[in-house]
Each structure stands twice: as C-alpha cells, then as structure tokens.
Amino acid sequence: MMTQTLLIELLTEELPPKALNNLGNHFAAAVAEGLEKAQLVDGAAEYTAYASPRRLAVQVKNVKAVQADQKIVKKGPAVANAVKDGAPTKALEGFARGAGAKIEDLTIVHDGKQDVYAYEYVQTGKLLGELLEDIINAAVKKLPIPKVMRWGSSTFTFVRPVHGLIVLHGGDIVNVSVLGLQSGNKTLGHRFLSDGEITIENADSYAEQMREQGKVVASFAERKAAIQTALEGQARRLNAAVAADEALLDEVTALVEWPVVLEAGFEEHFLAVPQECLILTMQQNQKYFPLLDQNGKLMNRFLLVSNLQTEDPSHIIQGNERVLRARLSDAEFFYKQDQKATLESRLPKLSGVVYHNKIGSQAERIERLQSIAAHIAKALGADAAAAERAARLAKADLVTEMVGEFPELQGTMGKYYARLDGETEEIAEAVEQHYQPRFAGDKLPESKIATAVALADKLETLVGIWGIGLIPTSDKDPYALRRSALGILRMLMQYGLDVNELIQTAFDSFPKGLLNEKTPSETADFMQARLAVLLQNDYPQDIVAAVLAKQPRRLDDVVAKLQAVASFKQLPEAAALAAANKRVQNLLKKADAELGVVNESLLQQDEEKALFAAAQGLQPKIAAAVAEGNFQTALSELASVKPQVDAFFDGVMVMAEDAAVKQNRLNLLNRLAEQMNAVADIALLGE
C-alpha cells in the first residue's frame, strides 16, 4: 500500500517558553501513538517533533491513506448449547441478531476449548481523513497543560489561542476540524522577517520551506544546537567560557524562531558587585549568557540571542545594553545600601520573619541553630565558638535588600557581607555553605564549621517540621524534608557522628512539649528509610537491606560495609552461610529462656564441640577486623566455619529433649549468629 509523509501544524500565539519543548514532544508522540493504534503506519511510527514560539508540529513518515481491510471473527455461544431439538436457542438467535447476520451466515470455529458459533466478515479499512480528526483532538487533550484559556467567542480551550491548522498527507490537504479550525496548507513564518503567508507544498518540504521562506527554524533541537554552537564559538573568540545551564539554553531556544547570537557589554564598575548577583540578573531577568575569564571571573562582556537578523545589529546590542545597565544599577544600589548595616545589627529584624507559626520566627530558629551547631562542632573536633557565630549570622541576609530582590542569593550574600563586617573567612564561608547540599549531587560543605551549621540547619528543619505533624506524604513535601534528610545523610557518611544522638540534640533544642514526643524515633526511622533509597542507587537491594538491618548509627563506614558484603556475596560459601544464618535466626526465635554463655561441659556431640571450637577461634579475628574497619576480612573469615556449620546442622538436633542441652545449643548458635552478623545480617542476601 502506498504511503506518504503526514504533516500536522498548530499555529498559535506565543507559547509558554518553559513548557514549549515538552508540549512539542508530547503532541508529536500522542499523534504517532494514535496513528499506530489506528494501524495507519506499520510498526512504530517514525516521526519528527517541531516546536517554536508560535507553533507545534509533527511530521510522520510512511502514513497510509487508508487502513488495511481486516478479517473480523465474532465468537458466540458454544455449539453444544446453541441448538435444542433441531432449533436455534435464544442465545444463538440473540448472537446472530447482535452481529447483524442471519443464522445461516454463521460458521463454527474452535476457540481453544470447544466449538462455538462465529460470524466472520471483512471490515473495510477507513480512510485517513475519517480517523485523523479524532487522533489530533485526542493528542491535544493529552497535552500536559496546567492552565488553559479561551479566545474570542470560541468555546475551545488551549494553552494559547490557535489561529491556523495544517494537515497534509504528501501534498494533499486532509480535511479535518480541530479547535474550531478547518485544516489547510497555509501558515505564517517569522513575525518580522518573513513576507507573510506561506503555502506548504508537501509534508516533506515543511522544515525547508519554513527556513527558506519563513525564516523559522522549526525544530527545537536544531535551534538549540545552533545557539549552543554559536555561543561557544563567540566565547572561544573572546578566550572566555559561557556561564549558562541547560534550563537557560532551553528557555532561550523557546523564545526565538531565527536565533542570532550577538556580543554586548557593560561598564566595568559594575564588576565591584558580587558576580553571583550580576550573573543572576543577566540570566534570570534578561536571559543573557554571561562570560567568565580563564580564572572563572565574570567579564564585562556577555552574549545575547536575538530573534532578528539585521545588516547592522548595533541598535539591538545598544538596546539590550541599556536595559541591562538599569538592572545592574539596581543590583549595585542594593549592594551599597546593604553595606550600611552589619549582619549582627540586622538580627532583631529576624523576629518579624515567620518560619512557621507553630515553631516561631527565624530569630527563634537562630537560637536553636547556635546550640545545635556548637554541639556538632565539638563532636567534630572543630571550633564550637566559630560554629555558633556562623549559625548566629546564617540567616541575617534574609532581611537584606539584595536577598529580598533575589532570594536565590541567600547565603551567598551573607558570605560577602560577613567578609565586609570583618568576620573570619571560615565563618563567612560557613554562612554561605550551610545551605549545602541544596539538591542531589550538590557539593557538601567544605569545612567542619560549615558542616556543623549545615547539619544544624537541616536537623532543626527536619525535627521541627516533623514534630508539628507536617510529615511528608507520597505526593506532598512542602518543607522539603526528604531533601533535608538526604543532605544530613550525605554529610554524616563523611563523619563518624551518631545520627540518633544528633536527632535527639535537635529535638531538645525546642521548648519542652512543643513537638510530638515520638518525633526522635519517627525521624530516625525516616532517616533509615531515606538512607536505603540513597544507597540503592549504587548497590543491590539485598545488600543494602543486610547492612541497614543492623541499624547503623554511624554512617561513615556504611559504604565500606556495603562493599565488603558485595565481595562476600561472590564467595562460593556465601549462599550456604546466608541460608545457615537464616536457619539459626529461626531457631533462636524458639528459645524459651534468655540466651547466655555456652557451657562447654554440656556439649555432647563431636559436631557441636567442633562448631564451638571454630566459633571460639573466629571471635577474636572478627572483633579485630571490625575494630580496624576491615569489614571484608571479617566477612571472609566466616567461610572458614562453613564445614563445621554444615556438620552441626547435619548431625545435631538443636531442640533436644533435655532442656539444658537444648538451651546450651541455642546459646552456641546465638554466639555464632553474633559473629556471622557482626557486619551485616547476611541472612537477607539473595532475598
């Protein structure tokens, strides 16, 4: 059957830039899925998504003009129940009537179990035009649009008003109606650079015609690549590097249809303002690309992406420089104003900054942070007074002009203002770094002082918010407690601190009776659960479960234990020892009395005597290896007792009739279990 390329384009008003690429990809995928389900393509649809500020489009290869005819078999009642006394039963008559057939038209087929009556017929395939309207409308309804709008007198809704619809199969218009628009083959190009209406001659020529006649690079991916290449080329020419993330590049790509990268600049005196402020202003407010020199310092040059191409771009450059100058002047003003007051003098204002009405203001938080940070610093062997001072100043920049304008700079501006106030560099850095890690993969605080304040901040948040009942759910975590827990865990995996003790310290910093009394135990369990999630990114679930079953309170050796268990699992004896350990644990659950020391005089059989001797020899080796942090050696030592363990279970009845003998054998197994599980609960391996 002959196939051709299908093109669908929705011509819109300017689409939301941050959502554009996602909308384009979803629309294209939904159309392709609809064509596949309608069997208008063979196999998986081969398609290209297009998305620019004023259009969403999809181009699908090898689309049929008509569905293939299908043989349909409708199965009815069993032959045995369909005829009675030579006459059709009501069941058979009802089936024939429902199928639109006469009884003599029915055939008999086997359904895999029995013979049944069936009606077989050929369903003629539908034309593309009969199916496409529903496919497009379904694709539009599936789009991830949080808010829709109406336009004019239309009752239709979409993310933005839609003014044109192209539906072409090859060079032929497919007549459909979508969002109140009749399909055609005409569209508009660039708002300023094109000469008006463009007639798309063929579905295959869409991208080329849009580029040549419309001055529109319709492909989001192609525009993005072109912008990135141009930015990098301009930066190399200036011996600089572009300061930009993927999100900014995506947003700028969504704002232009014909990207032109231009170089501009600003006055050097603005560089006296902390570069983080200037970079944020350029990126966030103006969508510009700042440039950094070889030392990572901001230059007074930047790159912008224009949606216009002119012979003389100087007026575009000057206009953008003028707008940026006003923005940078504001930042400069805020910076100078903030320097008129020290961070210390700003602290009283924190009383008016409510953190949560149940646990007080930021000023009250500061009191708690100081005590927690000092406690942690002592445990780390760091300067407790410095940690307390850093915690005292940590939130002071929240009431500065600069942070009021750019909340993203909290901590960063605190660092600069602390330096200007004469605080030590260690304290200034701690003020900034106490927010770290802000997200998964973010760097950790560099010093012990900064770590103490960062831990204090996150612990106080976790314990306080949890304690007033704002516990994270599967879909809600407004105070980012999961993120706080992850940050705490990552820091504690570098330092040998007791996580439960730190949680209790944070809990004790709140007024008595303010928080739920179960908070320490509940948050400790929450931390264990988050630790499992974190570790399962790098280790199998059974290995993580084995290590965490010991409920480690110090996390600095957890990774070493995971690595040791992973190595142990590869030993030939591992599976048998894990099974034996599980058997031991099941037997110990049956103990009637408290387990104690082994009475050597009650050992009767050679197998239990041999196991006792092996356990005796094993104990000091494992204890020494664990004390030295050599967990792999501790686990590998277990392989040496496998013969004695096997012989014991083959030849000894643990639950002997003699109560004293039974208790003694359970005591022996308990001693063995302590050694087998010194590093991890190996019974969980393989589960």
Swiss-Prot record:
**Catalytic reaction(s) noted:** tRNA(Gly) + glycine + ATP = glycyl-tRNA(Gly) + AMP + diphosphate
UniProt-annotated location(s): Cytoplasm
Where is it found, in Gene Ontology cellular component terms? cytosol
A Pfam family: DALR_1
| E.C. designation(s) | 6.1.1.14
Enzyme class label? ligase
For this chain's UniProt record, which GO biological process terms are given?
Answer: arginyl-tRNA aminoacylation; glycyl-tRNA aminoacylation
Quaternary context:
Tetramer of two alpha and two beta subunits.
User: HAMAP family this protein is in?
Assistant: Gly_tRNA_synth_beta (MF_00255)
Would you tell me the protein name for this molecule? Answer: Glycine--tRNA ligase beta subunit
- The encoding gene is glyS
